[in-house]
Regions:
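A structural signal for small-residue-enriched, beta-sheet-centric alpha/beta enzyme cores
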Residues: 2-22, 42-51, 79-114, 119, ...
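N-terminal structural module
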Residues: 19-38
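Short glycine/serine/threonine-rich phosphate/pyrophosphate-binding segments
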Residues: 26-27, 63, 118-121
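Helix N-cap motif at beta-to-alpha junctions
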Residues: 57-63
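Acidic-enriched and Gly/Ser
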Residues: 66-67
């Protein structure tokens, strides 16, 4: 039996992510990102002991500009700093979500070592299969995973 074709989704969302080893510098880095480009702040908070995670969304150029500003500000304190272009819209929405699903037929969960790999894995899953992302929870209260 042939698989049902997956619904086409818009793919043009960009996400910028920086993780640092220095919490106060994290806030300074977020300030630089928001001043450098027209991006939306999704998250800016300590993620686990001694680390800080910031995530922004926006157009490709704006997110790349914000990430460049973040890298300049964070310098060697950055664990990872990356602009991820052309994500499925569902991934960006799941990053912002506070889930309260009505009814689930089934449930899947992926655990990753880094926040960046969680976003990349979610994008691959939603582009390759017929799933609905509910949320992406990253690096808070779960040992940085």
């Amino acid at each position: 039996m042939a698989a049902t074709p997956r619904k086409e989704r818009a793919m043009g969302v960009s996400v910028g992510l920086i993780e640092l080893h220095h919490i106060p510098l994290g806030y300074e880095t977020v300030d630089a990102m928001l001043k450098a480009a027209d991006v939306e702040l999704v998250r800016a908070s300590p993620s686990c002991p001694g680390k800080f995670l910031a995530i922004v969304t926006g157009g490709v150029g704006a997110v790349e500009c914000a990430c460049a500003a973040a890298q300049r500000t964070a310098g060697r304190q950055a664990v990872v700093c990356r602009a991820i272009d052309h994500l499925d819209d569902a991934v960006a929405e799941a990053l912002k979500a506070r889930p309260r699903p009505d009814k689930l037929e089934s449930f899947g969960s992926i655990e990753t070592r880094t926040a960046l790999s969680a976003i990349l894995a979610a994008d691959l899953v939603v582009k390759a299969s017929r799933v609905r992302l509910i949320c992406i929870k990253m690096a808070q209260g779960i040992g940085g995973k």
